[in-house]
Amino acid sequence: IDIDRAEINKNIMIDQPVIGDVKEVLTRLLPMINERPADEWNADIEALKAKYPLTYDESALTGPYVVEEIYRATKGEAIISTDVGQHQMWAAQYYKYTKPHTLLTSGGLGTMGYGLGACIGAKMACPDKTVINIAGDGCFRMNLQELATASRYNIPIIQVVINNHVLGMVRQWQTLFYGKRYSQ
């Protein structure tokens, strides 16, 4: 959906473009959606999770372990934001989200540095909630100015940095798909 016809097919080819104001378009589309209960689908997903549980090396301080400990400490009641990288995947997989609007992430958009600003915004919107940003060392270096903002305005957020001394997801892809040809 885009209000500007010139944007359609500009960067990627669109199968079904919709030209218009997003509010108006969605207002017209929403009544056409038939709500389907997801109970059966959710049960299937839970069965797959039970059959193929996520595992990691529990003898070392790993990213998944850190995320699970954050979950235990917060009893799942925190709002979690993430930057981009392996820590983002661990936060999505190892923190057990049970409520909507408790995972703030840019998904696959690759926006390093997103998490801390999102964390600050969430804390401003929900001052009574514990709000935690989970970042890797690479992402953490992207936005120290936001940390200064949180400090200056006394915004009580929690910043967790999972430091593996490398851009972890980039390194993982180079290992898996590029014959261990690493960029420096």
Regions found by a protein language model. Name each.
Residues V25, T175-Q184:
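Conserved thiamine diphosphate
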Residues N9-M13, L147-T149, M169-Y178:
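Active-site-proximal loop->helix
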Residues I12, Q16-I19, A38, Y52-L61, ...:
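Hydrophobic alpha-helical scaffolding
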Residues E46-K123:
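Active-site diphosphate/adenylate-binding microenvironment
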Residues I8-N11, T27-R28, W90-A91, N143, ...:
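Short helix/loop capping segments that flank catalytic or ligand/cofactor-binding pockets
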